[in-house]
Structures are given as C-alpha cells and as structure tokens.
C-alpha cells in the first residue's frame, strides 16, 4: 500500500558536535577537552523527515508537528524544512522558550551519544496540539504517522492512538530511557512498525522480560532481534520490527520472518544521523509501496534493484555517514530510478524464515 501523506511529531532543533580525542567513554565525574566540529547537527524529526521530503516531497505531503522558538535558529530551521519540501503550516512558534538544542559527543571510532535540552520550545508539543493538528490534516488510511523522540511521551502516544483510530500506518521509535514508559502505556499495541537501535532494543526487551534481563545484555544480532520480536508479538501479533546495529547492519522482522541487511560499505565521516536517516529512508520506501522486506524473493548477487523499504533505509544511512553534517544534503529524487529503485552499493543479505 502506498501513502500520500506523512505526519509526525518529534524534536526540531539544532546542536553542536563535540569530538573526543580519545576512545575512552566519558566518566560520570570526568572533565575532558574536546574539539568542536564545524558540522551541523540536527534533532530527530528534522533528520527523519528531511529524507522523506527530499526524495518524495513532490508526490507525498510531509507534515512535521512540532515547535521551535521565536528566534533566529527557529526561523532558519523552518526555512531549511520548507526548502526540503516539508509543509510547515503546523509548526508552532514559542515566544518564551528557545529552539531545541542538542549536543553530540563523538568518539574517534565515529560512535557517540546525544544530550538534548528538555526545557525548549519542543515542550510546547502537547497531546491536544497533536490531536487538533491531525484532525485538521484529515489523517486517514492513506496516511503514515511517525512518533519520533524528543517531545513528550504523552504527545507521541497521542499521535499513535489518534493515528490508529483513523486507520493510519503507525511508526514508533523509542529511546532506551523511555522503554518502560511506552510499555506501561501499551504503546506497542498502537504501532505497525517499531524502529529501534541496538541499545533501544535491549531496553525494550529488558522492560518486557525482566526475568531474563541479564541474558538480554549478552544477546546480539539476530538473537536479540528474535527475542525482542517474540515479546512484542505477544502484545501486537501484526507488528513489524526494524533494528539497526550501526556498522554491523540491520535486521527486520515481518510476518515472523527475519531478514538481515548489511551496512553500506562507504567511507565514514559522521554516524550521528545514520539511524534517523535509515528510518527516513525506510518510511520513504513504505510510502512508495515497497514492502518492509524483500519477502520470499531472492536477489541475484549482481542485482541492483531495491526490493524493500529497509534497503532504501540502508541507502540513506550510507549517504548520511559520508556527510559531516547529521543530514546528507545531497539526497534528492534522482536517487529513485523511476518505478525500479536502484543502488549499486547494497548487496543481498542473508534471509531466513525463523519462527514456525
């Protein structure tokens, strides 16, 4: 099924990228001199939706629901979003609070962590604002809605609930620190696709399977994905799953079938926006009518046509890590080759039917 409208909420803001000169993880009480990168960093909703708008914004309406401050930063961000092809009519402006700020600390191996300011304009995103915006946008079965981090959990859950009631396809991304909150709110029953990274997958699994919490930390790759799927499927038998593992690739689960996607083999400059780019590309593929997985069809080794939404996600993540900024600005519709979507960088991964 194709979708002609994408509506989502999450953080919109900018930030700074700090580069650690040593690989050791920053200690709780440690002070460390770091380098400030000239790279531009952005908050999650902006990153995810940039790929959707840049690739298919001319045929699919893309509506971010969030807030920025009545400041220069907010005005610049809205301009960038419009330039990418997003509709910003439902972006609020706060006179009291500044635009969201995020700080990323990156280690020499290009991995890192993010800290995002809570008391920013994005805190103005409320469940009431979400519901009224979705009503005005006439969200329906032809709409994909996405709940992205960096606004309140209550607002994201309201978006999922409203989207589900209106027949939309619902996508959820859950930060590790909020796994318990979303489980208690039955949010996993309100989504069609759960998209998480390795750390987030462990957190959700630990919240669901406390008796085996110790084993969760030892699980990796397909074992972790299968255990997580077995837990969320009990709550939502139709749920699909996307789990990214950075340079180790990603896995999808759909219809009790596991599929592996290797990471694009490219030169890496910055990984901070890769996971969000993967999700943005995957959502784009779903809007185009691609299935999450290649299903039962096996590609020839030399085949370049993309057969799944997750493969388009891999392509976008590959573009992202080659860019110093957390958004790959060169993303454009030319990447999509007519009806057949092609990419020479992505090879066939291993597929297997796993749950009988």
Language-model features, listed with the residues they occupy:
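Conserved phosphate-binding/catalytic region of the ribokinase-like
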Residues: 1-10, 179-180, 207-356
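Glycine-rich phosphate/adenosyl-contacting loop at the front of the ribokinase-like
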Residues: 1-83, 268, 347-356
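A short helix->loop->beta-strand "cap" motif at the edges of active sites that frequently abuts
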Residues: 59, 165-169, 234-239
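A glycine-rich helix N-cap at a beta->alpha junction
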Residues: 80-97
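Conserved phosphate-binding/catalytic loop of the ribokinase/pfkB sugar-kinase fold
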Residues: 92-94, 104-144, 149
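Short beta-strand scaffold segments in enzyme catalytic cores
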Residues: 101-105, 114, 249-253
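Conserved beta-alpha-beta core of the PfkB/ribokinase-like small-molecule kinase fold
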Residues: 142-223, 248
């Amino acid at each position: 099924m194709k979708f002609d409208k994408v509506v989502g909420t999450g953080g919109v803001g900018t930030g700074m990228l700090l580069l650690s000169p040593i690989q050791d993880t920053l200690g709780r009480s440690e002070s460390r001199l770091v380098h400030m990168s000239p790279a531009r960093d952005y908050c999650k909703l902006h990153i995810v939706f940039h790929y959707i708008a840049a690739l298919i914004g001319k045929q699919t309406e893309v509506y971010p629901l969030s807030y920025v401050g009545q400041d220069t930063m907010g005005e610049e961000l809205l301009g960038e979003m419009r330039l990418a092809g997003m509709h910003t009519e439902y972006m609020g402006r706060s006179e009291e609070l500044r635009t969201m700020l995020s700080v990323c600390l990156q280690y020499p191996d290009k991995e890192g962590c993010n800290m995002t300011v809570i008391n920013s304009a994005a805190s103005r995103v409320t469940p009431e604002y979400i519901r009224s915006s979705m009503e005005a946008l006439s969200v329906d079965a032809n709409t994909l809605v996405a709940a992205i981090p960096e606004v309140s959990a209550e607002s994201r859950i309201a978006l999922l609930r409203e989207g589900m009631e209106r027949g939309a396809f619902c996508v959820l991304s859950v930060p590790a620190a909020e796994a318990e909150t979303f489980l208690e709110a039955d949010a996993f029953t309100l989504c069609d696709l759960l998209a998480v990274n390795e750390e987030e997958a462990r957190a959700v699994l630990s919240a669901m399977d406390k008796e085996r919490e110790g084993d969760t930390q030892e699980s990796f790759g397909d074992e972790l994905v299968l255990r997580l799927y077995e837990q969320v499927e009990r709550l939502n038998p139709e749920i699909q799953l996307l789990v990214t593992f950075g340079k180790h690739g990603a896995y999808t689960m759909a219809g009790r079938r596991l599929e592996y996607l290797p990471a694009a083999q490219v030169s890496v400059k910055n990984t901070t926006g890769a996971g969000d780019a993967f999700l943005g590309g995957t959502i784009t593929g779903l809007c185009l009518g691609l299935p999450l997985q290649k299903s039962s069809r096996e590609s020839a080794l030399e085949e370049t046509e993309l057969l799944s939404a997750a493969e388009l996600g891999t392509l976008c993540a590959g573009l992202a890590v080659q860019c110093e900024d957390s958004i790959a600005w060169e993303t454009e519709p030319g990447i999509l080759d007519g009806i057949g979507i092609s990419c020479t960088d992505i090879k066939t991964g291993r597929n297997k039917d796993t749950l009988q």
